[in-house]
């Protein structure tokens, strides 16, 4: 089973490696993600150099199907957040592909 990196883990890393106190580290992580959320709410692209880009994309309404009944139902139009990894992130992930289980 794979593990997940959480916001609490990020705050702990800031505490251990950069010397922030635990409260400051938690606030920094929360503020970082709040800024990303605010930018996306304001229809702005979020570009994190060396990591990737968060974009908003509008999806049109389309036909769908209820898997239990087979009944056709419309899937409403909506806005979604997409993430496109940057070249550096892609290269690092590809370099480690298949080395961990």
UniProtKB/Swiss-Prot annotation:
Q: Which UniProt keywords apply?
A: DNA recombination, DNA-binding, Transcription, Transcription regulation, Translation regulation
PROSITE patterns found in the cross-reference section:
HISTONE_LIKE
Q: Name one GO molecular function term.
A: structural constituent of chromatin
CDD domains the record matches = IHF_A (cd13835)
Going by the entry's taxonomy, the superkingdom of the source organism is recorded as Bacteria
Function statement: This protein is one of the two subunits of integration host factor, a specific DNA-binding protein that functions in genetic recombination as well as in transcriptional and translational control.
Report the sequence similarity comment from the record.
Belongs to the bacterial histone-like protein family.
What is the protein named? Integration host factor subunit alpha
Which species does this protein come from? Saccharophagus degradans (strain 2-40 / ATCC 43961 / DSM 17024)
């Amino acid at each position: 089973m794979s593990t997940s990196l959480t916001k609490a883990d990020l705050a702990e890393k800031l505490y251990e490696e950069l010397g922030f106190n635990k409260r400051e580290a938690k606030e920094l992580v929360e503020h970082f993600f709040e800024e990303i959320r605010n930018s996306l709410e304001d229809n702005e692209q979020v570009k994190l150099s060396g990591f990737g880009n968060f974009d908003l994309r509008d999806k049109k309404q389309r036909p769908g199907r209820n898997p239990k009944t087979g009944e056709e139902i419309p899937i409403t139009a909506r806005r979604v957040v997409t993430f496109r990894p940057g070249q550096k992130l892609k290269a690092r992930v590809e370099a480690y592909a298949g080395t961990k289980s």
